[in-house]
């Protein structure tokens, strides 16, 4: 990931992240990684309806274009993350890839890191579901803001 700091997010880079995540796994051996999803999937333990495989080829470039034209601040990162997770573009590993992208965006743009640790995992998932079902990232921004206050000493946001 360090090699990609300063490198623009592209569909190919997202696929590279997913390929690295699954390297050496059964998914990779079975040809189930290294590309966007081709089978409908869902978020485990959630009622959120994610994008269909046929929507991904246009939805991902649109999301990336929106990111490139954004102010690249805390709110933009939160919004991007909620939308990425709602698309759920890969067969597996979307949460891990989404959090990796979020960390890359924070580092590149001088934004306090948004870190979700185990003690906040359930709350994170609940807030993400609210953000995705209400078609707004306000909930995820509030959660990330409160998580930052808990995890970043001296944060005054």
PLM region spans:
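FIC/Doc superfamily catalytic core
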Residues: 1-157
């Amino acid at each position: 990931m360090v090699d990609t700091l300063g490198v623009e997010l592209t569909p190919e880079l997202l696929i590279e992240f997913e390929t690295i995540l699954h390297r050496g796994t059964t998914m990779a051996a079975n040809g189930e990684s290294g590309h966007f999803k081709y089978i409908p999937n869902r978020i485990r333990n959630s009622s959120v309806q994610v994008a269909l495989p046929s929507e991904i080829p246009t939805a991902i470039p649109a999301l990336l274009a929106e990111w490139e034209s954004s102010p690249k601040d805390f709110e933009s990162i939160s919004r991007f993350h909620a939308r990425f997770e709602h698309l759920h573009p890969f067969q597996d590993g979307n949460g891990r890839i989404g959090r990796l992208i979020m960390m890359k965006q924070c580092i590149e743009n001088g934004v306090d890191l948004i870190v979700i640790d185990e003690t906040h995992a359930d709350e994170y998932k609940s807030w993400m579901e609210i953000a995705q079902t209400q078609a707004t990232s306000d909930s995820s921004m509030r959660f990330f803001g409160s998580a930052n206050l808990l995890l970043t000493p001296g944060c005054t946001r």
